[in-house]
Amino acid sequence: EGEKNLENFIKKINKIYICDGHHRIQGMLKSNKKISPMIIAFPHNQIKILDYNRVLKSNLSSEKIISIISKNFKIKKIKNNSKNLKKGVLEMYMSNQWYLLKLIKKNKKLDVTILHENIISKIKATKIDFISGINGSSSLKKLVNSKKFNIAFKLCPTNISSVMSIADKNKFMPPKSTWFHPKP
């Protein structure tokens, strides 16, 4: 009877979004291998998306990086990073200083896409790592201060409606765009 209840419950579900591991599943489907992925379902209103930040190593000087970024962003030095970023606003930590980066022209793209197209692709990063927002901004600062990296970018979390809208258009988000919580 439990199986029948579960089956009836699943039949009532309109849409299912694969939020974590969709790139792996896509690869498995293309390879024609039989797959049996573990699936855990959460209602969209019970999922929280955290920021998924970047730390980079670039051989460019801080001044050159600021010059490149200033072509598309208003740059303001800030004492501490903020807790609530808005779409189109990023934070950067470099040379013991936090900066607020506000996009000059409004853009409908995801912040992660804007970051990659307007900054990361231009500053010739030699190394990049992705840091979950679950660890807070202090982990970004610590990694830069350790000299393993010299720049950190803190992003506004992507909202769930954007994730669903992109999926509804049969499009994919860039890798490492979201950090879903809870994690299965």
What name fits each language-model region?
Residues 1-184:
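Surface-exposed, charge/polar-rich loops and edge strands
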